[in-house]
A protein has these predicted regions:
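Acidic/polar low-complexity segments and flexible, solvent-exposed patches
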Residues: 1-97
């Protein structure tokens, strides 16, 4: 069975799907990521945030976007405060309809 077939099966049975998030920061310092997360909350409370440890880096990702266009729109809105923000594809939580 192919990887994509397995991925489709997992996403069908769960509340997950292939989508996009915005990577705000990836740093070796957890303290720096926490500081950026606090700054992010002040401006964008309505987006879900995900702090992920991907050795040796801690990453701050935001959003559960179904399309690249939607994620790009939000990334553009963040550029003035978070210049390094960019869109990444990954498994995201499906939004409730």
């Amino acid at each position: 069975r192919s990887y994509s077939a397995g991925l489709r099966e997992v996403t069908r049975r769960t509340n997950l799907s292939l989508g996009y998030r915005i990577l705000i920061i990836s740093d070796r310092s957890d303290a720096i990521v926490n500081q950026v997360m606090s700054e992010f909350y002040r401006s964008f409370r309505n987006l879900p945030t995900y702090k992920v440890f991907n050795s040796p880096y801690t990453e701050l990702k935001v959003g559960d976007f179904s399309t690249y266009l939607e994620a790009s729109y939000w990334a553009y809105q963040m550029k003035s405060d978070f210049r390094g923000a960019y869109v990444v594809q990954e498994i995201v939580n499906r939004r409730k309809k």
